[in-house]
């Protein structure tokens, strides 16, 4: 397991075709095989361990784009899963990466990873869904949501002004009192998430601070996109997918993960005992080793 020490990931900014800016963080050597990482809700591309030696050994680079309104990325209120998939392809084109890449997504980032694979199948070689969620606005998936997630979707769509105000308030807390704010979130977590977040406190604190940039606008727009019809079908994904999920996940319980795997053609699922929503931090080496084996050798 990599040690959660400060590293030197490289921040970049790409000009998109419509004039917006897309910010991203690159981990590793730009000459190595590329993996796109989609960050979680309320976070940013800064949420990854910086383990340079591991990336060199596996000959991988990770590109972690910030969704619109996050970090250095311009606000885009019309955000959808397909629109961000197109942004990612524009990013790859701007970086001179024409071949198929690996794709990862943590939490709601898993839905963005699926959207990229479904919308641009020629650009995705393989994918990993890490503690993923389902698209809340898809009619078929909705029937598999827990009562809590159905209620959260209803609240986001029915009282959007209240959620916008909440995210604005949270953005101010992250900007003014980051240590106090992450301590508050830790107190609200389930045991499995609490243990890991304490260990990676500084990394996750800074990632959330960037996530709530632009007055929390990006977080709100991401939530709206998540709650609306996704604009793609899960069955359109052609690349092989692997699912990692914790049996003790207190954010997204694993009960509907077999359903998602079935819709992905029987994708393999790793259900990890006693692990929670932050399992990507606990299993980073194994996750990257699996991805390296899924990608063609350069």
Put a short name on every predicted segment.
Residues 31-32, 39-44, 247:
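Active-site glycine-rich loops that stabilize anionic/oxyanionic intermediates
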Residues 41-53:
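The serine-hydrolase catalytic nucleophile loop
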Residues 55-74:
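Conserved alpha/beta-hydrolase
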Residues 83-101:
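Conserved acidic catalytic loop of the alpha/beta-hydrolase fold
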Residues 147-232:
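Alpha/beta-hydrolase
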Residues 237, 243-245, 249:
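Short beta-strand/loop motif that positions the catalytic acidic residue
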Residues 250-256:
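Conserved alpha/beta-hydrolase "acid-adjacent" motif
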Residues 267-298:
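Catalytic active-site module of serine/aspartate enzymes centered on a nucleophile-bearing elbow/loop
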């Amino acid at each position: 397991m990599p040690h959660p020490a400060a590293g030197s990931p490289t921040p970049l900014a790409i000009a998109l075709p419509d004039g917006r800016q897309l910010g991203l963080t690159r981990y590793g050597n730009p000459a190595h095989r590329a993996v796109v990482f989609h960050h979680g809700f309320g976070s940013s591309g800064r949420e990854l361990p910086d383990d340079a030696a591991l990336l060199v050994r596996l000959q991988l680079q990770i590109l972690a784009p910030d969704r619109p309104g996050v970090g250095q990325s311009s606000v885009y209120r019309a955000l959808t899963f397909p629109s961000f998939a197109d942004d990612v392809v524009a990013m790859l084109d701007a970086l001179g990466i024409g071949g198929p890449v690996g794709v990862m997504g943590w939490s709601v980032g898993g839905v963005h990873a699926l959207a990229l694979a479904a919308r641009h199948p020629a650009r995705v070689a393989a994918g990993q869904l890490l503690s993923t969620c389902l698209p809340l606005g898809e009619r078929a998936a909705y029937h598999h949501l827990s009562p809590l997630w159905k209620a959260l979707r209803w609240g986001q769509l029915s009282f959007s002004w209240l959620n916008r105000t909440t995210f604005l308030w949270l953005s101010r807390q992250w900007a003014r009192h980051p240590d106090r704010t992450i301590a508050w979130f830790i107190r609200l977590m389930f045991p499995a998430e609490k243990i890991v977040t304490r260990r990676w406190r500084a990394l996750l604190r800074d990632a959330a601070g960037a996530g709530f940039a632009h007055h929390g606008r990006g977080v709100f727009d991401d939530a709206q996109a998540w709650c609306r019809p996704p604009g793609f079908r899960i069955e359109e994904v052609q690349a092989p997918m692997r699912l990692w999920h914790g049996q003790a996940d207190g954010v997204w319980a694993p009960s509907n993960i077999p359903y998602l795997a079935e819709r992905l053609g029987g994708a393999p699922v790793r259900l990890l005992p006693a692990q929670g929503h932050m399992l990507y931090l606990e299993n980073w080496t194994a996750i990257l080793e699996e991805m390296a084996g899924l990608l063609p050798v350069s």
